[in-house]
Amino acid sequence: FYAKKVLKPLGADISASQFLEPDGMFMNHAPNPEDREAMNAVSLQVISTGAHLGIIFDTDVDRSAAVDSKGREISRNGIVAMAAALVAEEHPGTTVVTDSITSRQLTAFLEDGLGLKHMRFKRGYRNVINKAIELNSQGVDCQLAIETSGHAALKENYFLDDGAYLATKIVIKAAKLFADGVMIDDVI
């Protein structure tokens, strides 16, 4: 659905897209951005076709991850960093709530590199989302709640955990960079 009904009408070349017809059997690999086989399939497809970007979703599209044009995964701490960088452009200094298993390097990137505030909270996408909502109700600007699993919820999207929403923001950023002669790989 996403490739055909969202990306293609926007002018994206989806010819390298794979596994677009749902059959409920998942014969190719588990539809999971945390699954090694699934991420390898996306990476290999991006490399073999020369695509600029690859996107992967889980079955209900509430989690996503990406692959750059060199086949490098943008998942786990990487997807958190990318989502936070997108948010930082529009909301400098905001708080980002993540699950507790993020790395110290991610905290350094968010706080020192992007000028954001990072709050680690207990695992569970509902936990990080509820914490973000709570912070906002207390007057603390929090625009992003995200787990390393790829569950991402943005305030601008009513804190819905929506992998397609985050993927679309990544695709838009990649397209803008490409229009300026820059690949997303160059800014990761």
Question: What role is predicted for each listed range?
Answer:
Residues 12, 16-19, 72-91, 163-172:
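Gly/Ser/Thr-rich active-site loops/lids in small-molecule metabolic enzymes
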Residues 33-44, 77-78, 138-145:
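Short, structured secondary-structure boundary patches
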